[in-house]
Amino acid sequence: MLEKIAEVQKKLSKRIVEKEVRMVSKIAAVDVSYKGNKARVALVICSFPDCKVLKTKVLETEVSFPYIPTFFFLRETRPILLVTKGEEFDVLIVEGHGKAHPRKYGLASHIGLILGKPTIGVAKKLLRGTPENSYRKVGKAYVSVGNMITLKDAVRIIEKLLDGGYPKPLKLADKLSKGKISEDENTLPSDKTS
């Protein structure tokens, strides 16, 4: 079964578009945490480039697919689509790889293809077999194209959002998804790392 899914990933990777993103005023970031089969997904929308938090949203849902490296998109797509539904943003930052993936089609690419919006993949570690020209290291983050953005634009956006080596909206989404802060706490202290 996974072999067939891997083939589908390879085919879908050919549908990923890289293009310049010019007007960016709202950035969204999304992260998912788990307790057993329960997913807690957090969305943070902030202004760009000053990163003032405009909205936060947290949802919980059941997931049925287990964590399998390089097939992360099968586990996280549904929670991310639920939390982003009806929300407005120019670019979405996903905690997970985009083209920095052995089959050039990670979670950020899958979400970008479904939403039809520019997406950036951001991760703390590389996957084994990742093509070298598919990412850039920015601070502590491995940044890659999800969909509808160039690597140059993705890097430029992430550089402006860095806080302690990682994009501030993604750090906030991580803390929200893990319940370390509540939705009412819509700021993240600067110079603190998670």
UniProtKB/Swiss-Prot annotation:
Binding positions (Mg(2+)): D31, E95
Disulfide topology: none
GO process annotations (BP): DNA repair
GO cellular component, one term: cytoplasm
A molecular function GO annotation: RNA endonuclease activity, producing 5'-phosphomonoesters
Reactions this protein catalyses: Endonucleolytic cleavage at apurinic or apyrimidinic sites to products with a 5'-phosphate
E.C. number(s) listed in UniProt: 3.1.21.7
PANTHER family: ENDONUCLEASE V
Entries under HAMAP family matching the protein: Endonuclease_5
Protein known as: Endonuclease V
Species the sequence originates in: Pyrococcus abyssi (strain GE5 / Orsay)
Name of the gene this protein is made from: nfi
